[in-house]
């Protein structure tokens, strides 16, 4: 087992990474909670059917209460938060209670937000069950819910007490889910870890085969990168924005397709292709550098096609959380392993890269079309 510490000015917590962690969760939680504290697990029926017994095996007779939330982006909304909060209240949860977010990134984000606001804040831990959640959303304290007008427009910073990333759960992931999570790992390499990027470039076949050693190496590198960034910029005042590489257009794609058909990592994959091309258009990358990045992004595809109008994507980017005072901020690459935040992207440049992206989508004879 590897342990990676996430340290900020106000909090420190461990990310445990390895095989066979689920039965160990209960014993480690005893060190984090007061005697007789209530523990509540928030999970989906699907995850519980696969891994619930394994997680409960360490609790003995003092089994936590389980609250179910259906999987899917459509349930990442305030109505779900209210429903879960009501269930906690009816069950007698108090300020000493602890929540366990046992699922993918959507469930983890929502459970973290619930923990942040229930009784003005209670503790929680993350047990991410997708690769994307293990390397990204479970680390760093961002929590939230979606509005109809955009993704994660309601939320707070609320760090977990611990993260348990058990690689065993990844073996039940559909291959498409695994590939979507690997897009976030490619992102980590592009923005801040050239060695990780090169490793993923050389070992795509082994990584895509879900080799334990290869996956653990990639996950550990991505988590360390994010922990380092969060330590330097907890509240996204500057450096932490680089973690949004590919997310400006990625979130726009999710918004205009109504969160249907594309997984988050797939939308980010398309967004990274666009960000890489915009970096080339601006002269930050050479054509060779841009092509190399795009080859590795596509090596962890295929990316599903989607249908969207350029104007709809343009409008969605205007609501991006990175924007300030009407200025569109973009995270662009300067070289492999280094990203920068650009604040002067013009509408003309954005229209040009959206046109380029939609042409690439039309040319992609992969999977199926989604969206409307």
Curated annotation (Swiss-Prot):
Top-rank EC class of the record's enzyme: lyase
Origin superkingdom: Bacteria
CDD domains named among the record's database cross-references: DHQS (cd08195)
Enzyme Commission number: 4.2.3.4
Keywords noted in UniProt: Amino-acid biosynthesis, Aromatic amino acid biosynthesis, Cobalt, Cytoplasm, Lyase, Metal-binding, NAD, Nucleotide-binding, Zinc
Single GO MF annotation: metal ion binding
Cofactor(s) this protein requires: Co(2+); Zn(2+); NAD(+)
Protein residues bound to Zn(2+): 184, 247, 264
Reaction(s) catalysed by this chain's protein: 7-phospho-2-dehydro-3-deoxy-D-arabino-heptonate = 3-dehydroquinate + phosphate
Cofactor note: Binds 1 divalent metal cation per subunit. Can use either Co(2+) or Zn(2+).
Xref: HAMAP family: DHQ_synthase (MF_00110)
Family statement drawn from the similarity comment of this UniProt entry: Belongs to the sugar phosphate cyclases superfamily. Dehydroquinate synthase family.
Physiological role: Catalyzes the conversion of 3-deoxy-D-arabino-heptulosonate 7-phosphate (DAHP) to dehydroquinate (DHQ).
Protein name, as recorded: 3-dehydroquinate synthase
